[in-house]
From Swiss-Prot:
Name this protein carries in UniProt: Polyribonucleotide nucleotidyltransferase
A single cellular component GO annotation: cytosol
Keyword list, A-Z: Cytoplasm, Magnesium, Metal-binding, Nucleotidyltransferase, RNA-binding, Transferase
Lineage: Bacteria, Bacillati, Bacillota, Tissierellia, Tissierellales
A matching Pfam family: S1
Domain S1 motif: 620-688
GO biological process entries: mRNA catabolic process; RNA processing
UniProt-listed Enzyme Commission number(s): 2.7.7.8
Positions of Mg(2+) binding: D484, D490
Species, as recorded: Finegoldia magna (strain ATCC 29328 / DSM 20472 / WAL 2508) (Peptostreptococcus magnus)
């Protein structure tokens, strides 16, 4: 049976259709707003996956170019690997759902959101998140939702729920929030340097709408929902738990706190092997995995107990203490800018490259095509955590971390008018013990300043953590890897001294309160200011000069109708400039021309040549022209690139010229004067006007003849 539901989200109608498509999926729905339509499905396996100790959830977002009336490029004309935007949307779907499955549930679950039709005002990401919650809620998969999701913009201090394309372009905030009726589950934001109070108000405003969306989904679930699969958590062997605990807990307590990550891991793993070996010998091999799991749970419990009860962190820091920080710049000779940022045992090298406008990344997917002139990419090689494994292309984590750091710096990147370069920053994680994405924010700032990029303000990032047991809550500043792994929250905040530029929150519990959010934001602000002060001691302002290896860019604006003259037929004119000067030239339809050369001299020479091309001839001006063609009646002379005038045979010299070839030949350079331009733009030139007038010998000869004649008469 097909059922349709409608929901009004702040003036925008959302339509949900159940039972029309994908009937073999555990749960499926069509969700529509405006002309954006998505199919969202949820499928779960009937049995748990063998040999895993994690929840195998996969969320995918499929961009179909037919949804915007496009045909894929390339030879095969088929959608390829997911775009960066699709990957980020898949992460948005995944993050609020993952904590809402029963502990110990190891069945495979796959959620797929497919964009079938997309308009520019109703972005598919929010619909995909809501549709995923609906598909899981009406399925028989044991999902503990529902969740709701909204986007929030801010224009002139006013919050806008699910802003349109035009509103997004004007907004100082790009916030995505997901949560349940009771708590916030996920936050993702890019901000134009706004305050913590404004961010918090926006999150709370979003949660008001999320509660209503959850109620809407619950009403659908009541009518269409399937009975949930019965999931019984595996019974614990209490006796074995106690036996393992009594055998190793005292030794575990002694080695839990250690400032050195690798040394701590060595001790923890050595003890674990001895514990497993002891019980395998005592019982049999089949018990090994159970003992290993019990040991891991003991380690987690001990770390959390120390923090909650004794306020002792695994590396012996105070709760709000930030690890030791070192900064360095200009460490690589050839790249255009470089910065090395180290916080504890996390170290990131960020490298900046300055390019021309044509180096900008062209984004052409479900959104309108646009150029991206600031790019940040994040790499996490295996050696950064002491692993030996094959190198692969960037995964979802790398793409997500790179996008977060990019978003953090974007508000301070100068406009193209101020700084006409394309900017690419690559952050290489050299060593990781947590907060590497925020270290890449700090490293990027150092690198950009070293490259001479006039960023508006330095940006720093910090990751906050949370340990929560019932009402006992502890917030941690600058979390390391273990605290991220065993804690309940990873809350990343980046910004300047004045406000927030990017935010990302992921939690592993069923939500956090307003009070926790408020305290976490304030603690992050204090930590961020501390980090910025240390970075400023290393470099506080952009270098006055860009690298000698960076291209020199000059910009000239000409009349739009003159662009074709600069390009010339088949690119003949522009290619000649490029060949003669060795520069790179980018033209735009609005008349903006960007010239990039290896040095200032070559770029300036190209600019001068362009000026000559677009220069308008003026009557009465003198020009050094080149003879392009000889005719019986005169010669055509090019006085400016692409601009020829007629030098009539009578205007070549004061004396009579019998044949043009007697005085001129092709490619001769001569000085001429522009005498006239007729209504059709044809130019009349004169060489004669610039030549000195000869003495009138004819008159002298006449006088002499007269004298001779008079003498004869006498």
């Amino acid at each position: 049976m097909i059922k349709k539901y409608e929901y009004d989200l702040c003036g925008k109608k959302i339509e949900v259709t159940i039972g029309k498509v994908a009937e073999q999926a555990n749960g499926a729905c069509l969700i529509q707003s405006g002309e954006t339509v998505l199919l969202v499905t949820a499928v779960g396996s009937k049995e748990p996956r063998e040999g895993v100790d994690f929840f195998p959830l996969t969320c995918d977002f499929e961009e179909k170019l037919y949804s915007v009336g496009k045909i894929p490029g390339g030879f095969i004309k088929r959608e390829g690997r997911p775009s960066e935007k699709a990957t980020l949307t898949a992460r948005l779907i995944d993050r609020p759902l993952r904590p809402l499955f029963p502990e110990g549930y190891h069945n495979d679950v796959q959620v797929i959101a497919t964009a079938l039709s997309v308009d520019q005002d109703n972005t598919p990401d929010i619909l995909a998140m809501i549709g995923s919650s609906i598909a899981l809620s009406i399925s028989d998969i044991p999902f503990l939702g529902p969740t709701g999701s909204v986007a929030v913009g801010m224009i002139d201090g006013e919050f806008i729920i699910n802003p349109t394309k035009e509103q997004r372009e004007k907004s100082d905030l790009e916030l995505t929030v997901a949560g349940t009726k009771d708590a916030i589950m996920m936050v993702e934001a890019g901000c134009n340097n706004i305050t913590e109070q404004q961010v918090l108000k926006a999150i709370l405003r979003a949660h008001e709408e999320i509660k209503k969306i959850c109620e809407f989904i619950e009403s659908i679930q009541k009518e269409c929902g399937k009975p949930k699969q019965e999931f019984i958590q595996p019974e614990k062997n209490i006796e074995l738990d106690e036996e393992v605990k009594s055998f190793c807990i005292e030794d575990l307590k002694k080695i839990t706190v250690n400032e050195d990550k690798l040394d701590r891991e060595d001790h923890i793993n050595t003890l674990k092997r001895s514990v497993v070996d002891y019980f395998v010998e005592k019982y049999d091999e089949s018990i090994a995995s159970k003992v290993s799991t019990i040991y891991d749970d003991l380690e987690k419990s001990e770390v959390r107990r120390l923090i909650l009860e004794d306020y002792i962190r695994p590396d012996n820091r105070k709760l709000d203490q930030i690890r030791e920080i070192t900064c360095d710049v200009d460490i690589l000779p050839r790249p255009h800018g470089s910065g090395l940022f180290k916080r504890g045992q996390t170290q990131v090298l960020s490298v900046t490259t300055l390019g021309t406008p044509s180096d900008a990344q062209v984004l052409d997917g479900l959104i309108e095509q646009e150029d991206k002139r600031y790019m940040h990419q994040y790499n996490f090689p295996p050696y950064s955590v002491g692993d030996a494994r094959p190198l692969r292309s960037p995964g979802r984590r790398e793409i997500g971390h790179g996008a977060l750091a990019e978003r953090a710096l974007l508000p301070v990147i100068p406009s193209e008018e101020e700084f006409p370069y394309t900017i690419r920053v690559v952050s290489e994680v050299l060593s990781s013990n947590g907060s590497s994405s925020q270290a890449s924010v700090c490293g990027s700032t150092l690198s950009l300043l070293d490259a001479g990029v006039p960023i508006k303000e330095p940006v720093a990032g910090i990751a906050m953590g949370l340990i929560k047991e019932d009402d006992n809550v502890v917030i941690l500043s600058d979390i390391q890897g273990l605290e991220d792994h065993l804690g309940d929250m990873d809350f990343k905040v980046a910004g300047t001294k004045d406000g927030i530029t990017a935010l990302q929150m992921d939690i592993k519990i069923t939500g956090i309160s307003e009070e926790i959010l408020t305290e976490a934001l304030e603690r992050a602000r204090v930590g961020r200011l501390h980090i910025l002060s240390l970075m400023n001691e290393c470099i506080s302002e952009p270098n006055k000069e860009i690298s000698k290896y960076a291209p020199r860019i000059m910009v000239i604006n000409i009349a739009p109708e003159k662009v074709r003259e600069v390009i010339g037929p088949g690119g003949k004119v522009i290619n000649k400039i490029i060949d003669e000067t060795g520069v790179k030239i980018d033209t735009e339809d609005d008349g903006k021309i960007t010239v990039a050369g290896e040095n200032t001299e070559s770029a300036q020479r190209a600019i001068d040549m362009i000026k000559e091309i677009v220069r308008e001839p003026e009557i009465g001006e003198k020009y050094l022209g080149r003879v392009t063609k000889i005719m019986n009646f005169g010669a055509f002379v090019e006085i400016l690139p692409g601009k020829e005038g007629l030098l009539h045979i009578s205007n070549i010299a004061h004396e009579r010229t019998n044949k043009v070839e007697d005085v001129l030949k092709e490619n001769d350079e001569i000085m001429v004067k522009l005498m006239d331009i007729d209504d059709q733009g044809k130019m009349t030139l004169s060489r004669k006007a610039l030549l000195p007038k000869p003495e009138r010998k004819e008159k002298k000869n006449f006088d002499k003849k007269s004298e001779d004649q008079n003498s004869e008469d006498k």
